[in-house]
Amino acid sequence: MALTYPHLLSPVKVGGVVLRNRLICTASNPHFIQATEKWPTEALITHYANKAKAGAAVVTCKGNNPVKTTDPHSLTLDIHTGQHQHMFAQVAEAVHYYGAKASYLVLPDMNIVKGYDASDGVLSEFVAGDGSKAELGKAAPRELLYRMVEEYGKEAKLAQSLGFDMCFM
């Protein structure tokens, strides 16, 4: 019997980084794994660690800026608050313990981009700022896009300082 993906579990070198296989866990936050905490709880840290333990080469942690939302189940973590940062560092450490690379999902600050979208008149779930409903937005001006690039860079640097190996955008 021939394997469809014979190299799936083989190591791969991407740039200067060697991944133990080609399994990548994208961002996931189970909605009910924690309450309203704005930092990764032990349960969420264990969730990410288990993905690494199960064999993923890269585990992506979601940790965007908190926003006011109409979704009561929205899980928005806050990596920018100093007293929360050690918990994000524990996520990276737990993922590293099982031999995986820790990735951090960088998302736009919805407080900045609310009301804007990629183009005028396109129905989008991102216009409302929380994904709760689709609305028509207006095209983001160039200045806002440059500001977002700066914010992405700052957040990526912060994640790196807390032990994350890469960012997912």
Task: Name what the model sees in each region.
Residues 1-169:
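Flavin-dependent oxidoreductase catalytic cores
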